[in-house]
Amino acid sequence: MNGHFAAIGNGPTAKQYDHGIQVIDEDKSFNTNLNDYLTETHVAESGFNYHLISVFGSQSTGKSTLLNHLFGTQFSVMSETERRQTTKGIWLSKNKRDSANGSPMADNILVMDVEGTDGRERGEDQDFERKSALFALATSEVLIVNIWEHQVGLYQGANMGLLKTVFEVNLQLFLKDRQSQTRSLLFFVIRDFVGNTPLENLRTTLITDLSKIWSSISKPQGLEDSKIEDYFDFAFSALPHKIYQPEKFLAEVDRLGARFTTGHRSTKDQEFGGGVFLPEYHRRIPADGLSVYAGGVWDQIVNNKDLDLPTQQELLAQFRCDEIAREVLVGFDTVIAPLEEQQVEAIRLGKPAAVLADLGAQGAGAREKCIKAFETQASRYHKGVYTMKRGELESKIDTRLKALYQAQLTAAHKAGVAAFSEAVSGAVKAGQKAGGSYEFAEIVAKQKAKTLQIFKTEAKSLSIPGVAWSNFKPQYKLFEKELDEVSARLRKEEMRRLAIRVERWVRSRLGDAIGLEFNKLGSGRGGSVSPEGGEKPATEKDLWDRVWNAFIGIVKEAETRFAERAKSFEASPEEVEVGLWRLRRKSWVALREKIEEEVMESNILMKLRENFEDKFRYDEDGVPRIWRPTDDIEGIYTKARESTLGLVPLLSRFRLSETYAPPDLPAFIGVQPAGVEPEDEEDLLPIGGIDEEEGKSLEEETTVLGESKRQDLVVRFKKMADGVYVEAKRSAIGGITQVPLYFYVILLILGWNEILMVLRNPFLILLILVMGGGTYIAYSLNLLGPMMQMSNAAFNQAVDIGKDRLRDFLVNNETARQALAVPARQMGADISLDRLDSRGKKAQDISDDDDI
């Protein structure tokens, strides 16, 4: 029972595959191991480069024997001593011969040995006969009809019933898809050919019988007049008797084998010679999908369903394309999955997404390799299904690549923005360290071009030719837009820093200029001795005019500096306008703060005192006054005091002398520009008369000293002025104190005798002159102090020496010693002298014990 073949239910082995495989068993079950056999025999990888042949004929007519000799197969054959069925179901084996009759045979020829018809085992049951014919016609290019010469002209003997079935199922299968116009080759192999009847005559008989059968079958509408030649080609070959002419039989079989190669439709002689495999015979089922296709066809046949081959081809294409897609995606995953994991890991760890190196080349390479592998294997299937599945595969690949690439561009976007910001900030800092000689706009333009080029290079590396979504122009535009936003932010920050530098410059200049104007209040002197400029101000009433003019000049210069520097930033006119508006507001606040500093209680009181003292202590020429009793101290005091007190109302309010009104602060600051944003106002202090919502008027804004402060200042100034007046009064009165004249008369009368004694003694006169001159010289040279110290030291030294002499006398005098009970002094003792320092004091004793 053909037990040496790989039958259904048996585990497939290489040895069994060497003998073929039972595709359909006698119970009409399909063998799912067919694909294993095709793989083992290397047919599955051949694509369309294979050919499938089926052989039909009555039972025990030598079909299997013919195939074994023709293709080198090992199908089971009937024993010559028995007459029973040998081939059950449908068997398949690969051609084992490479050439025949010296000519190469076609590659990968698959031969199906179909169970013979008219067998006693099945009897009247023709169901399997019809199903096997339908299966063979749906899968095979060439149908070999094995008949004996003496059966030609018979109906049953020539298998005309089987051929009628073939014609009917042909209409059932292929005429549903009229666009394909699939043809088949009926190859009649006439066995035991004697040669009495020419093969041409046998052909004519067979064609005539076949045409009658074709005319008798029912045809679809519109094909009633069709001919059999419209759907079938015919080929004929004759073989001698195998038993009686074995050598000739083998020679003719060898010649017949040479015809199983690729042929071309040319002439009628094609039926008797030339290759039998024409392109239009091929069912266009790739070898790797043949098993699935055959299984689907048989399932439809065995379940008596309406077999639709185009649908089966589409189903096969869908199955195989899905299978191929899964296979090629494995290689794609090998490349892409690690890259996806790197991005996911970075997100999980909270790290900024890193730009993966060479991602574009890896992604594009994996995509191209995957799609090419799919094309190579799947393009052989149904074109519509293949195109659809290719699109689905590309969609799957592109979905993953797009997510990966988008994350890559997002990382490049973030890294680029950060690098751009750092580069600009670093260049600005370097320029500031180098002395401030840098152009912000040039730095921004250079770094922007560099950053855009890096991003563009990365985006181009991710671009895939012909893939619309990989054209990252929107992302490039978005990146460029954000760089512009960052540039604007950096420019705004730089303008803020510029504004701060200008504000510092304004504060510095205001500190000098305003301090100078207020310092002039401390001088009431004129002439060359006046402290500022050699001349005092013409009038003190124009203090605020001078302050305002100095302020306006400084601010105008600051505005010019700011505007010129802002141009190098390529700042818009609106940004410059906002910056100047902020500068004017900040400058006014700085002026107010400086004025408040100058009018602090201690500062303003000191300036008022200096102003008063200059007017009171100095005359109009700036010469200090020496008070005499005859001077009008009260009048000068009153005038100087009232003049100085007149400064208090002047200092109380910021008013210009010409209009006696505050300066036009709203006009100076100007209307708030339309481009001012909330953040531009965060650090601005409210200004009265400008910011009405603060509820502070311009009059209040320009008030420097409040009423209570003014009164307190006046009281304290008057007390201070009164003290100066009392001091001057005392000075005048102290200058008139002198010795009365009668004192000199009394001194002359009482000291007349002493005067005469001195005058009469020249030595006394000389002594007095010498002592007086020496004293004057010592006084002039500041030697009186040292002389007194030396005298004091000499006196103290004399006292000590006297004490030592007295002690020596008491010790050496017997009477005194006995009286005082003092022991005798050793002889040879010296009287010690003290060492004096530079101030005439005893120096500390230095012991000589350390020298021992």
From Swiss-Prot:
Keyword GTP-binding: yes
One of the GO BP terms on file: endoplasmic reticulum membrane fusion
Signal peptide from the UniProt entry: none
Binding positions (GTP): 57-64
Localisation: Endoplasmic reticulum membrane
Membrane topology note: Multi-pass membrane protein
Main EC class the enzyme belongs to: hydrolase
CDD domains assigned to the protein according to its UniProt record, in alphabetical order: GBP
Stored Pfam families: RHD3_GTPase, Sey1_3HB
Segments forming a coiled coil: 475-500
EC number: 3.6.5.-
Taxonomic superkingdom: Eukaryota
Annotated ranges, domain GB1/RHD3-type G: 47-294
GO molecular function, one term: GTP binding
Main location, first listed in the record: endoplasmic reticulum
SUPFAM superfamilies: P-loop containing nucleoside triphosphate hydrolases
Lumenal side: 760-762
Family: Belongs to the TRAFAC class dynamin-like GTPase superfamily. GB1/RHD3 GTPase family. RHD3 subfamily.
Function: Cooperates with the reticulon proteins and tubule-shaping DP1 family proteins to generate and maintain the structure of the tubular endoplasmic reticulum network. Has GTPase activity, which is required for its function in ER organization.
Protein name as it appears in the record: Protein SEY1
